Amino acid sequence: MNTQQLAKLRSIVPEMRRVRHIHFVGIGGAGMGGIAEVLANEGYQISGSDLAPNPVTQQLTSLGATIFFNHRPENVRDASVVVVSSAISADNPEIVAAHEARIPVIRRAEMLAELMRFRHGIAIAGTHGKTTTTAMVSSIYAEAGLDPTFVNGGLVKAAGVHARLGHSRYLIAEADESDASFLHLQPMVAIVTNIEADHMDTYHGDFENLKQTFINFLHNLPFYGRAVMCVDDPVIRELLPRVGRQTTTYGFSEDADVRVEDYQQIGPQGHFTLLRQGMPDLHVTLNAPGRHNALNAAAAVAVATEEGIDDDAILRALESFQGTGRRFDFLGEFPLEPVNGKAGTAMLVDDYGHHPTEVDATIKAARAGWPDKNLVMLFQPHRYTRTRDLYDDFANVLTQVDALLMLDVYPAGEAPTPGADSRSLCRTIRNRGKIDPILVSDPAQVATMLAPVLTGNDLILVQGAGNVGKIARYLSEIKLKPQIQEEEQHG
């Protein structure tokens, strides 16, 4: 939306003239930065604050946004509205100052809902797969020439950004259930990929509460809207009779409306057939590994088919799909020093998955595409509460790799929980007798501690949602070779 379109919107909604300056607290987060980017391109004055620069803040600065790397009351001066991340506490000085100045303070999802209000909204929700599915839907719509606006929680690699302003009526957005704020959204189409117990503090530890919240989200659809849901997921199958909207199901299940058949993986690509009711079968080559990504593609195809998008555009988009940042993100293949007299290489893959189901899917994709590789994982648990609540699941999943290095828990603001730390998890895994995990207390020592477990035919998965992605990039920069200065500093 350019300046002319912004003027048109303000003529439709005269009250929008009151909003000129939008301030974001926690602007460096992917979800926050994406919305800020769309609004900057719509012509609004954007400012924001965060603790440190990152690629998101750099992109926003290039668009003319003012970024403060501190949290001070004066940062919100002259703001028309303050948008706050769910990670920001109520006693943040900018939030306090905004309330004192009677500046409206809203959550990220409320602003996303305003962006969606006058567009054809497509919202992608679920415990796992949201970011990739959002990127797939966006890629198909772009390939079909529909020029969508999209707001994603991860980097869309084909576009090089988390969000992009299109000039059509379509807005494709990731919907976040972590704080239940997706209830603000009122889309025309909603995808639900799966529902598992996660972020249970938001739902007071009550899984029934979580399930009902997803139902409430789907009931934000108009009666003529459509819910696209993965029938392979047992919770979704259970909830389907309670969804009072038109539904399309997808999955490997025989009763799915859009059914995945004959899946096989060759290296990083999946090959499968999609069977659609009353439509020609689609023989898909998907440039993303794993059965879980075939499901994500089936969801995207279900939405695109309902919209009437040409099959050729769908197939082109999936075959050329470039993925999203930190979702089985291939960082390179690096030569290693000779091992047992033979030179070899190691592939390096960075992945955001931090729930046992996600980690399991990543491991399965790696095994399917590269069955002969020595599978090495560098894992960083994310949050003590998640590690505590899913402790046995983590222990079971992590024993599937050939070698495991584990960093300390990334706390994300939480206090340590006894028995839910990395040392305890390593001990539990070791006692099961399959692998002997290595605890890495000093991240600077990762390359040094990684070297002895490599065989010369390796696939290294760097796994987690904390700051482990920075370690993955560092390993790529040094080509997996331990640095002398590190050894001197920490030896």
Swiss-Prot record:
Pfam families: Mur_ligase (PF01225), Mur_ligase_C (PF02875), Mur_ligase_M (PF08245). GO terms for biological process: cell division; cell wall organization; peptidoglycan biosynthetic process; regulation of cell shape. NCBIfam families: murC. It is an enzyme of class 6 (ligase). GO terms for molecular function: ATP binding; UDP-N-acetylmuramate-L-alanine ligase activity. ATP binds at residues 126-132. It is found in: Cytoplasm. Its EC number is 6.3.2.8. Belongs to the MurCDEF family. It catalyses: UDP-N-acetyl-alpha-D-muramate + L-alanine + ATP = UDP-N-acetyl-alpha-D-muramoyl-L-alanine + ADP + phosphate + H(+). This is UDP-N-acetylmuramate--L-alanine ligase. The gene is murC. Its main location: cytoplasm. Pathway: Cell wall biogenesis; peptidoglycan biosynthesis. InterPro entries: Mur-like_cat_sf, Mur_ligase_C, Mur_ligase_C_dom_sf, Mur_ligase_cen, Mur_ligase_N, MurCDEF_pg_biosynth, UDP-N-AcMur_Ala_ligase_MurC. HAMAP family: MurC. Gene3D superfamilies: Mur ligase, C-terminal domain, Mur-like, catalytic domain, NAD(P)-binding Rossmann-like Domain. SUPFAM superfamilies: MurCD N-terminal domain, MurD-like peptide ligases, catalytic domain, MurD-like peptide ligases, peptide-binding domain. Keywords: ATP-binding, Cell cycle, Cell division, Cell shape, Cell wall biogenesis/degradation, Cytoplasm, Ligase, Nucleotide-binding, Peptidoglycan synthesis. Cell wall formation. GO terms for cellular component: cytoplasm. It comes from the Bacteria.
